[in-house]
Amino acid sequence: MSRPRCSRCQRPSSLCLCALIPALDSRTQVLVLQHSSEASHALNTARLAALGLCNAELRVGERFEDDCDAARLSYLLFPGEDAIPLGSLADAAQPVRLIVPDGTWRKARKILHVNPWLAELPRVALPEGLSSRYRLRKAPMPGVLSTIEAIVTALNLLESPSRFDELLRPFDALIEGQIDAMGREVYQRNHADT
């Protein structure tokens, strides 16, 4: 029998993170396109980001409809040779819409592949050399962040340094809860060098 879950954060009721999730407003609209395989993942950071941002939406699936609004410039937050530095949009006269694919790198690339309209959007990238707080996963390459970390970094660059850091509180608690559940000794043995 499965444990009762919080209907909002989807965590087991005894590990509910809702008290830590802020309600932050942003000028930037965030649309997270989450691969369906991530939706039930225990460490689902995209859901935390969407819950903590008043101007965010989370869509789950693999194929998504193009509903880009001409009144709001849309950008794809995803690295690539043609990606422009995200910070260059900080002084944009009109609000922007940031579209963020969520999943493993392989699944995120698949989202881009099966949704050709995403490839038509201008890409923006985070600065190089960032380090992740995600101590439970080994990054496939240096400078890789979880979805929530990428969104917080992006919003801090676009709007105001450190204004969105509060969104990382439930993420930090999520990581600590997982470490406590596995035991500190197991964590040290398997993840201490990540």
PLM-predicted stretches and their roles:
Residues 28-65:
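Extended interfacial segments that mediate partner engagement and assembly in macromolecular machines
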Residues 35, 79, 128:
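Cofactor-binding loop segments of dinucleotide-utilizing enzymes, especially the Rossmann-like FAD-
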Residues 50-113, 117:
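S-adenosyl-L-methionine/SAH cofactor-binding core of RNA-modifying enzymes
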